[in-house]
């Protein structure tokens, strides 16, 4: 059961998205929190005061070395715990699994280079100790899991999974299996990533002159155009030609039904299954457009328990990449047949930017909120649906009424990795 959701995502008006109400206010309107400065990007404007208000008392010896990833991951965790009415500092999570998904390494680079460039012959002892603490906390992908484990004083499983943009989706599957087999009663899953705007700008400049060379080496299973970041992302729109990135963190609290019932927790819904597949190509950067392995992941999730005709909504994973839209459309046709035209399938990546590892947790949180509200959020920035869509992308800026008990949420990783999560209302 999902009993708590918390966020540290780009917002509007200088305030991050932190709570379920904040998230719904943005997603239900199809609003975009992306800002343009050479490239479009979703920034989390988390002030020191906001952080200190939610996380007082952390020893400065550790906190002054926190990266943005640490800060975002800790804030989304305490927001999710507050939503679930659990106190991470009073032992409520002492036996919980604290699981983190991380896709990128941008937040780790500065600490890594600081140690690499330090001169042991001239550095002072106190400065050397500061570098050591910063490095221990920040140079590996386990950075956020380390500080979350410390905050909660957890004695349970505590580790990081890196599967690109499917990282937290994979961790949700692991958490579900841990709870189902009785290993833990509570699992807290966070997806967090930070993307360097400087790096994105430099990539954009490098790629501007590289298209002709790329045309000469590309294979049929690679997109015809190199990525672009300088126009607004429009998933499922006929004008889609760009991907925008964003930073941030999303945390969900998962519990066994018995544990949640004993303490009278609010139930958003449940994670019924999760499956991961790969396209099987020899090219490490490509994916195929038939969607066959996405179909396989969905069918593993459904099993004999749920029929596809019982799933009227899918939270799509499109980031504006036309290849992603193509394999999603083909997969939907294979799964739903003539019923595909009635399927509602939307993406809110245009609200916050493509944020990597948080996407799995964000998809679950958004979908369960839609289920609870009985409304499907529109696809952000989609105004003119693409011609090749086999489903209804819910264009515009208004929600669509839908009473539903089952849904799917999709996430992908570069190289053809596909994740599908089957979600249900609390009582199914």
Spans of model-derived segments:
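Condensing-enzyme catalytic core mediating Claisen C-C bond formation in acyl metabolism
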Residues: 1-12, 16, 20-25, 31-37, ...
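Short beta-strand segments
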Residues: 4-6, 99-101, 162, 187-193, ...
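A glycine- and small-residue-enriched flexible loop/hinge segment at structural boundaries
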Residues: 35-86, 90, 100-109, 140-155
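Glycine/charged-rich beta-loop-alpha catalytic/anionic-binding loops adjacent to active sites
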Residues: 54-61, 123-134, 151-161, 231-238, ...
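Active-site nucleophile and cofactor-binding loops and adjacent substrate-binding regions
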Residues: 65-70, 91-93, 128-140, 159-168, ...
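Active-site-proximal gating segment of KS-fold condensing enzymes and close homologs
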Residues: 102-159, 204-223, 324-338
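Glycine-/small-residue-rich "gating" segment that lines the acyl/pantetheine channel
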Residues: 120-132, 173, 192-259, 397-402
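Claisen-condensing/thiolase-fold acyl-transfer catalytic domains that form or cleave C-C bonds
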Residues: 165-180, 242-246, 250-265, 279-428
